[in-house]
Amino acid sequence: MVEVEKKIKEGLTFDDVLLVPQYSEVLPHEVDVSTYLTKRIKLNIPIVSAAMDTVTEARLAIALAREGGIGIIHRNLPIKKQAEEVEKVKKSESGMIINPVTVKPDTRVKEALDIMAKYKISGVPVVDEERKLIGILTNRDLRFIKPEDYSKPVSEFMTKENLITAPEGITLDEAEEIFRKYKIEKLPIVDKEGKIKGLITIKDIVKRKKYPNACKDELGRLRVGAAVGTGEETLDRVAALVEAGVDVIVVDTAHGHSKRVLETVEKIKANFPEVDVIAGNVATAEGTKALIEAGADAVKVGVGPGSICTTRIVAGVGVPQLTAIMEAASAAREYDIPIIADGGIRYSGDIVKALAAGASAVMLGNLLAGTEEAPGETIYYQGRAYKVYRGMGSLGAMSSRLSSDRYGQEKMEKFVPEGIEGRVPYKGKLADVVYQLVGGLRSGMGYVGARNIKELQEKAKFVRITWAGYRESHVHDVQITREAPNYWVD
C-alpha cells in the first residue's frame, strides 16, 4: 500500500492556492491584458466563450468580440445553421465589407426586405449582371411602401441619381469625412469600371469608436470561432464554416487525447491549412503534446472541471484544473503553442490563477450563461430571473445527436450522460460581466507586479492554503446586505 501511495500524484485546483503579492510598480489600469489565442489570432482580453448551446450563438459572440474576446459557436446545430451564425458575426460590422450583400434591379421588394431582415442591415446596393453599381436601396426608400408594392422590382424604389461612391484604397478616416459632408449612411466602394468592390457604413464607423477594444480580423470584421466534432460530416461542416468566414475551428471533445481526435485534427489541417485549429480537451502533458504534433494551433485543457460536468463522478476520470493547466503548459511551452483553460472558473481571481499557471486564455461557460446575450431560455423562479444552462454531455444536449460524439456516444441508443441541466441567475449585459472579470484580472496582475500576461506567468508565486485559509479568504462572520457584482456565495 505504501508503494501505491508513492505513485499517486497530488492534484490542485483554484481554491487550493493563492497568488503571493509582490513588489509592484504597476497600477491595475496600466496593465496589458491582451494575449494570443493562437500564434496568428490576438485577443484584447483573454476570454473565450464556451461552445455550448446555452452559451454561444451569434448574439453573444458579437458582444464578446466587441469587448476584445472571442466566441465559439456551438455545434449542436445543423451545418447550414451553424455557418449562418458565423456569418452573422462576420457581417455584423466591418471596416469595409468586402463582399457586401447585393440585389439585382429585378429583385422583388419583399425578397429585398427579407434579405435586409436576415442580415440586420438597413440597405443593399443594387447591381447589374456584371456587378456594376446602378443604385442603392435603403430603409428610407422603402419607408412608405404599401403591401401591393411588395411584388414590384426594387428598381422602382432604389436611389439611382447622384450616387456617392468612393474608390478602392480609401481609408476609414477619409470615409468618415465623406459621410459627414454628404450626410449619407452607406458608401459603396467601386473600381474604375464601376463594379462594386466593397461597402462602408456609418454604423461601422460609429461602432469602431464605440468599441475600440474589439477583436477584429485584418478586414475589420469581428472574429469568431466554431466547434466541430469527429463524426463523418466533420469536413463538410468545416468547409461550410470556412466559407462563412470563421477565424478558428475548435475540435471539441471530452477526451482529446484519443486516436479519433488526433486524426480529425490532421485531416482538418491537411484540407484547410489556412484556418487555425484548437483541439481538446486534455488534462496531461502527454495529451497536449499529442495534439500539438497532430497540428493543433492551440490546446484546450480541462477534463471534468465545469460546473455542469459530471465526468469525474460518472467516469471517475479527470485532473484538478490548476494541475492540469500547469502540466499542459509545460508541454506546450516547448512548441510555443498557447493553451486555453476550459472550465472551473468561478471568480475573476480564478482567471488570474489560470493565466499565472500557464494558460494564454480562459474559456467561460457558467459565468457567461446568465447574460442577456446567451441563447439559454430565461425562466422565473420565486420571483427571480434565471437562464437555462446545461452541459453538452447532458441528456438534453446529447438527444439531438449532433453533440453526442463529443462523449463518444453517437451510435448508442441510450445515453450515459456526463453533464446536467440547470439554471444560473440572470446577470444582465455581457459587457458588464466582462468589465468585472477583466477588472479582477487587472487587480491581480497589479498585486503581482505584472505589466502583461507573460510577466504574470514569469513572476507568479503560488502558496497552497488549508481549508481554514480558504474560509478566511471568503466573506465570513457577517451577513451580506448589499451584493457586489463580482462576488457571490453558493
Curated annotation (Swiss-Prot):
The name this protein carries in UniProt is Inosine-5'-monophosphate dehydrogenase
Where along the chain is IMP bound?
Answer: S307, D342, G343, G344, G365, N366, Y389, R390, G391, M392, G393, E418
The family database entries (SUPFAM superfamilies) matched by this protein are listed as: CBS-domain pair, Inosine monophosphate dehydrogenase (IMPDH)
Q: In which pathway does it act?
A: Purine metabolism; XMP biosynthesis via de novo pathway; XMP from IMP: step 1/1
Q: Which GO terms describe its biological process?
A: GMP biosynthetic process; GTP biosynthetic process
Q: How is its activity regulated?
A: Mycophenolic acid (MPA) is a non-competitive inhibitor that prevents formation of the closed enzyme conformation by binding to the same site as the amobile flap. In contrast, mizoribine monophosphate (MZP) is a competitive inhibitor that induces the closed conformation. MPA is a potent inhibitor of mammalian IMPDHs but a poor inhibitor of the bacterial enzymes. MZP is a more potent inhibitor of bacterial IMPDH.
- CDD domains under this entry? CBS_pair_IMPDH, IMPDH
Keywords associated with the record: CBS domain, GMP biosynthesis, Metal-binding, NAD, Oxidoreductase, Potassium, Purine biosynthesis, Repeat
Residues engaged in binding NAD(+) = D252, G302, V303, G304
Under the heading HAMAP family, the entry gives: IMPDH
Q: Which PROSITE patterns match?
A: CBS, IMP_DH_GMP_RED
Q: Name one GO molecular function term.
A: IMP dehydrogenase activity
Give residues annotated as binding K(+): G304, G306, C309, E472, S473, H474
Which residues are annotated as active site? C309, R406
| Disulfide cysteine pairs (residue numbers) | none
Question: Residue ranges of the CBS domain?
Answer: 96-154, 158-218
What's its EC? 1.1.1.205
Q: How does it assemble?
A: Homotetramer.
Cofactor(s) for this UniProt protein = K(+)
